[in-house]
Amino acid sequence: MRNRTLADLDRVVALGGGHGLGRVLSSLSSLGSRLTGIVTTTDNGGSTGRIRRSEGGIAWGDMRNCLNQLITEPSVASAMFEYRFGGNGELSGHNLGNLMLKALDHLSVRPLEAINLIRNLLKVDTHLIPMSEHPVDLMAIDDQGHEVYGEVNIDQLTTPIQELLLTPNVPATREAVHAINEADLIIIGPGSFYTSLMPILLLKEIAQALRRTPAPMVYIGNLGRELSLPAANLKLESKLAIMEQYVGKKVIDAVIVGPKVDVSAVKERIVIQEVLEASDIPYRHDRQLLHNALEKALQALG
């Protein structure tokens, strides 16, 4: 029997936020509705942060970023969704996509309904699910025991992080848990370690689903050095250990990293190490190279 390929899988689930998750989803967009992204919703900076401070609700920025990268048919709707206001007025810096998602959130019973309305408008087949449909922020405790609230402040820390929490304690979106339960393959990364990847793993229902699933899990490492000093100073094996500490079980079966990463301390996991950089932006993954690396990981997993 031949080894499985990505095209053979019925359900692929990717976890993360920011540009990284969007890159993974766009590299696998040929899977269509068999692909699901579970998106971090703790951002409190930029346009997203301004909307949250004035209107409340979940953070829409990472969701918008994923939708932007999944648009394959340019249209008036997609141009509107990607538009960012300039100038010095009250709308300066706001992304229209964030405002559209927030408006649809007001008009919908659930944030997930707002996302599905936008997906249909933009002709995006990939399922996108917020990690939680409740407003939530990230909190860190630094090495001095100080509480640091919000992604923006956590990104500015210069000392090690001792603990991460979500505040308040919120439930995961039930469809996200179901997607993990049904998955044939789970992917996490790339992305900002503490502020894009870890928030999803802090949800107890997500952690429980990851402990229980028989699906293999692949971690994709960043290509560039993180701007956050606590994250930038972590070695690959430390990141894997921290993720699994919060999940409560050894769950990562394979890692995909660039050629410069030290993998000598990574034991009992499949390592796919090769050139992955996009030609235009070296710290971003090339979509085809990433797709090929995921195929190799799947083949090695058997």
Swiss-Prot record:
GO terms for biological process, alphabetical: regulation of cell shape
Pfam families per UniProt: CofD
CDD domains with a match to the protein in the record: YvcK_like
Primary residence: cytoplasm
Signal peptide: none
Keywords: Cytoplasm
InterPro entries hit by this protein: CofD, CofD-like_dom_sf, Gluconeogen_factor
Gene Ontology molecular-function annotations: LPPG:FO 2-phospho-L-lactate transferase activity
Keyword Ion transport: no
Taxonomy, superkingdom: Bacteria
Gene3D superfamilies: CofD-like domains
One term under GO cellular component: cytoplasm
Compartments in which it is found: Cytoplasm
NCBIfam families listed in its UniProt record: CofD_related
HAMAP family the UniProt entry points to: Gluconeogen_factor
Other comment: Was shown to partially rescue a mgfK mutant in B.subtilis, suggesting that the function of this protein is conserved in different bacteria.
Role, per record: Required for morphogenesis under gluconeogenic growth conditions.
Family label: Belongs to the gluconeogenesis factor family.
Listed name of the protein: Putative gluconeogenesis factor
Native source species: Escherichia coli (strain K12)
Name of the gene encoding the protein in the UniProt record: ybhK
